[in-house]
């Protein structure tokens, strides 16, 4: 299973924010600069992360973005659930004539659930804790 770039960059943005000192604000421009992604794409990603409570956005002169809750409370599996369309196959009877007897959808759904269950073993904090090589790459001190 390959994650969409939307989810990929959502995770990267969260990792960047988690690598900052607790509560420190950053900007969408800073995140886009670090990862080399378009500002327009990142705005959409941050809006989605904000809608689901993973990011807090503050407007104004001293505004910016930061994690919506502590990094140790953000499960990687939950992020993927919030960002990723998890339907692997299109099983409508209009599309596929074997749908009434097909077992593939159930198998694929079980695989997705196993994938998410494994991701639930890790938090955003696990991605950044004691990871000085990451801090250097992100230019975070």
Curated annotation (Swiss-Prot):
One of the GO BP terms on file: negative regulation of DNA-templated transcription
Residue span(s) of domain HTH rrf2-type: 2-129
Keyword Cell membrane: no
One of the record's GO cellular component terms: cytosol
Manner of cofactor binding, per the entry note: Binds 1 [2Fe-2S] cluster per subunit.
Function: Nitric oxide-sensitive repressor of genes involved in protecting the cell against nitrosative stress. May require iron for activity.
Protein known as: HTH-type transcriptional repressor NsrR
Organism whose genome encodes this protein: Yersinia pestis
Gene: nsrR
């Amino acid at each position: 299973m390959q994650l969409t770039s939307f989810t990929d960059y959502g995770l990267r943005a969260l990792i960047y924010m988690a690598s900052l000192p607790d509560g420190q604000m950053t900007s969408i421009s800073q995140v886009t600069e670090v990862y080399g992604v378009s500002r327009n794409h990142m705005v959409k990603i941050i809006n989605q992360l904000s809608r689901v409570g993973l990011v807090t956005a503050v407007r104004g002169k001293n505004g910016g973005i930061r994690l919506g809750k502590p990094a140790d409370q953000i499960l990687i599996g939950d992020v993927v659930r919030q960002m990723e369309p998890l339907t692997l196959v299109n099983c409508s009877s209009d599309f596929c004539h074997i749908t009434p007897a097909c077992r593939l959808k159930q198998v694929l759904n079980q695989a997705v659930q196993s994938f998410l269950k494994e991701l639930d073993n890790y938090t955003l904090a696990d991605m950044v804790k004691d990871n000085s090589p990451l801090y250097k790459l992100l230019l975070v001190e």
